[in-house]
Amino acid sequence: MTLKPIHVIGGGMAGSEAAWQIASAGVPVILHEMRGVRGTDAHQTDKLAELVCSNSFRSDDHTTNAVGVIHEEMRRANGLIITTAKDHQVPAGSALAVDREGFSEAITAKLEAHPLVTIVREEIAGLPPEDWDSVIVATGPLTSIALAEAVRAHTGETDLAFFDAIAPIVYFESIDMDKAWRQSRYDKAGPSGDTAAYINCPMTEEQYNAFLDALLAAPKTEFRDWEKDTPYFEGCLPIEVMAERGRETLRFGPMKPVGLTNPHNPTVKAHAIVQLRQDNALGTLWNMVGFQTKLKYAAQTDIFRMIPGLEKAEFARLGGIHRNTFLNSPKLLDRQLRMKSMPRLRFAGQVTGVEGYVESAAMGLLAGRFAAAERLGQRLEPPPPTTAMGALISHITGGHLAEKQTFQPMNVNFGLFPDITDYSKTDENGKRLRGKDKGRAKKIAQAIRALQDFDAWLAGEAVVAAE
């Protein structure tokens, strides 16, 4: 029986990986890539999986780093991107960095050589034709205007963003709750009935002024040339831009102190208050409300640790603002990465709201496997949320708690994983682990569990395929 091909739109990290996974499952795939007939503002070549920004895939340590764990999961799943990266590795300490030209040339050659892969150089302007019954849209942060507008028209204007304004995210366990407290402004209950939905960090006038001075003096990351024509919009101004408008601007904006009472010191009115809002269903990650920023990373950690309660903050993600195209995935996509309102379309990569090469490729890997299984008359469930890939797909398709307008791209990190308590909390001498040593032990346990559960998922996938 001749199988009808699956169409993949976009030959970046996610699209290349998706095409490889589909073909590896024995299903024909047509990969549509517009570069070659139409360029982008950022790409330099027409090669597949071209690395636009950094040449680093970040940490390759799968024992204590969530990025390394997703690397290892992708290796075990015959991931094209991660195995090719290893073949073109350049020295970078514990990170996996690649020779970018050799890497993209190798990806292109492997896909061109596969008998089930057809590469078509064309732009898909608008939604795919109706007779394409299985499509993966993996068009990345620089999705063409025509396709982006078609998706936006179908989903609704507020459900597709063209600029991500990322606020820092803090691990809950690193927040000093002896200084901070839980309370919603004016004790107003949210949809869940919770009147203590925010964590509040108070500042005196002296602390606020010192914070403001540091903020104004801090080094900032400049926009790339192809981002400069994307203006700020008022709802997502960088915090340092707000500060430049006047010393009181932040106190009447994201740091306003009204409607809140510090239970640690109830008779003293805070001069300013920084709020953090829960960012995932597990309650392990909290984002700094209104703190989107273009500050350089080192400056962010130094300055944000000036905030009372965040002196020892550990960041799951630092802030940033750059041009991007991404869906409000928790609202629009199901657990198979299909658009709920048009199930023939799957989405993969950065357009789903993941951030980074590795995360994009991982979502391409899953989308490709989901689509191939469906074409073969099977149903493949996502990996469990205890795995790196499972945690990431759970986050973008339902684990993100905040209002739809606040969904922003996310890197993989252990804060997305379910908590784990079954691990040794003592060292080899029986001494109780504390601080960073305890955190390291927990990460090791989470990494071990992730890879065990991922292997079990792969084994289950093989059983489904054999049925």
Swiss-Prot record:
The keyword Cell membrane does not apply. One of its GO terms (cellular component) is cytosol. FAD binds at residues 10-15. Its cofactor is FAD. Its EC number is 2.1.1.74. GO terms for biological process: tRNA methylation; tRNA wobble uridine modification. Disulfide bonds: none annotated. It comes from the Bacteria. It is an enzyme of class 2 (transferase). GO terms for molecular function: flavin adenine dinucleotide binding; tRNA (uracil(54)-C5)-methyltransferase activity, 5,10-methylenetetrahydrofolate-dependent. PANTHER family: GLUCOSE INHIBITED DIVISION PROTEIN A (PTHR11806), METHYLENETETRAHYDROFOLATE--TRNA-(URACIL-5-)-METHYLTRANSFERASE TRMFO (PTHR11806:SF2). Catalyzes the folate-dependent formation of 5-methyl-uridine at position 54 (M-5-U54) in all tRNAs. NCBIfam families: gid_trmFO, PRK05335.1. Belongs to the MnmG family. TrmFO subfamily. This is Methylenetetrahydrofolate--tRNA-(uracil-5-)-methyltransferase TrmFO. It comes from Hyphomonas neptunium (strain ATCC 15444). The gene is trmFO.
